[in-house]
Amino acid sequence: MSQDYLWFLAAVFFALIGFGLHYAQKHPTRWALRFQVTTSVILIVWAIIILVIQFLIVVEASKKVEPGLDYVIVLGGRIKENGKPSKALRERLDMVVDYARDNQDTYFVLSGGRGEDEPCTEAEGMAEYLIEEGVRKDRLLVELQSRNTHQNIWYSKALIEKNIQDNLGTMNGNLGDNAGPVLVAEEKPKRIGILTSDFHLFRAMGLARKAEYREFYGISAKCDVWLYLHFAMRETLAILKDKFMGYM
């Protein structure tokens, strides 16, 4: 569902509420009074829900960045018609550039398929931007199929697990054909970061928890206030939807 569509639905909803309250004041019957009370309760409950969710979003986004992670999953965003990342996505990628410079052993999983109005997959657009900014290509893994945050989390987890197994196979292959049976002790869990915009991080972390990530940390890319406010309503609805669907 597009952002504009959500704003339109919200505008229609509050317009209907406003019309109903105005009508109830002009025609003060018993049913009108009940409508006023019911509507007021709904609005108060909705306001409390929004405030609680926004508080949780701010708390999650304020946590300290964990250094030295094995993998960082970078959640995709819109790629513009000219192939360049949107403002919100560019802020995420600039955070990747900084983290890559300070943490030389970290791999980055770029997660995002191709939207209807995008010239390429979000993962490919992100990879191109990061390579231009000096991040080595061999540190990038691309996940090209996901279409939403839920899929970002699950598909990226599968890609990381495959990469770990491939590296383990390479290690065993280097031992030679005559090495005999090899017992490999279970490795400690890989430390995984999830990097996305500040308004988006709380939901992404909830989805990762449901997907049974073992040791994971959030990395928040700050966005400007107006962009945050623009996404606040959509993210609130998305969190409620994912909670209802059992994704969080």
Language model segments and positions:
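Membrane-water interface at transmembrane helix exits
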Residues: 21-25, 49-57, 241
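Alpha-helical transmembrane segments of integral membrane proteins
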Residues: 8-10, 34-44
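Transmembrane helix-loop junctions in multipass membrane proteins, especially transporters and channels
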Residues: 26, 58-62, 246-247
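Membrane-embedded alpha-helical segments of integral membrane proteins
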Residues: 1-25
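Alpha-helical transmembrane segments
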Residues: 15-19, 42-52
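Membrane-interface helix-boundary motifs at transmembrane edges
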Residues: 24-36
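A structural signal for short, hydrophobic/glycine-enriched beta-strand patches
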Residues: 45, 51-234
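A transmembrane-helix-recognition feature enriched in membrane-embedded lipid enzymes
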Residues: 229-248
